[in-house]
């Protein structure tokens, strides 16, 4: 009996083991397996700085960001990104890639950021970047690029930032932009290259939003008058590329490296450059002024009819028919732009981008729209009411003047105040008499040595004055109070004292 139990247990164990092996054959491999020498964190796969000379054999399908920078990779295999359908960012900087090849990005249609900086790339061919329709940022700086195919960036319709600095490029087509479109591109970095010639008309034809971040500093540009006027105008307009790297914009005065001078600091080199040497380099932007709530329509007037017209709003939104996402801006069938009710958010630079087979190059037109708030209407001023009020006040004042008697108490107060004053009244007859009085004596002042008193001011009445006979003396005391004329004292001299009683004082 014990042997039977042991045999049953052995059979069960064998059955369980065979079932487990069958399940292992049916289940797919774990997609979260992390490659050797790499670090996996959620949707991030980092293999940076591991000394890899070849690509990892198995990559997890959940990776949205893959970092392979700071390794020793020399080649990328076609279709190596096929398992990574969610990939959005790929970093391949600081490797030893000298060529890309056909089909290396075929299965990376969702890629947004591609970093190929600090490698050994010498040439970019037309098919090297195929399959990157959604790419927005491409970093190619610090390579050895000497040549770009005419359509090297063909198909990158969503590219907005392109960095090509620190390479060996001696030319660049600003007319064609090597297959790039103007509708999305906002940053173009060509600094620190070997650009010895640039087409000034092609530069001038670029839209302002691209000029704002077009970096051309640290290039052996010639000290050309037309280029000088163009860059100086950009500098005066305050474009970021010129403002941020003002001192790095240099040119060669004598076509030798030792003759490098700064554009905006050595005016003597350009003293013979007149404005007439570069007429019409840029079409001035049209200034438009409108008010909130009004309607606005902008026309893309090109030299010849354009096959394709697009607009760029002040918020860098690409506007094609039917219009903006919020519906406030419409692009009509003729290519014009219409705004039904202007708001403050519509202020800024509108750029029209026109292209077509009949145009020699893509044309741009710019409208700088200023939106003003409507002035509040002043409150209505009721002139009739104010006129009536003024008439009533004037009538009351006239009636008071005509019929209101003066205040007697006020008169008494005025008289009392006048008595208390210490200066003479101008209309007093006694004061007039004192002013015309004279001092007479029996002894005439015939002696020349006789002097009048220095303490009294006297006046002699004319001899012909009637009624005085030259004998009446009016003497006023020095301490006489002019405010109290009743205290006047008449004093007779020693010789005329007896005659004053009989003859008396005669006043008229």
From Swiss-Prot:
Glycosylation sites: 107, 272, 301, 362, 368
Swiss-Prot/TrEMBL LRR repeat ranges: 62-83, 86-107, 110-131, 134-155, 158-178, 184-207
UniProt KW Methyltransferase keyword: no
PROSITE patterns to which the protein is assigned, alphabetical: IG_LIKE
Membrane topology, record value: Single-pass type I membrane protein
Side Extracellular, residues: 20-383
SUPFAM superfamilies found in the cross-reference section: Immunoglobulin (SSF48726), L domain-like (SSF52058)
Quaternary structure annotation from Swiss-Prot or TrEMBL: Binds AMIGO1 or AMIGO2.
Protein name (database record): Amphoterin-induced protein 3
Organism whose genome encodes this protein: Rattus norvegicus
Gene: Amigo3
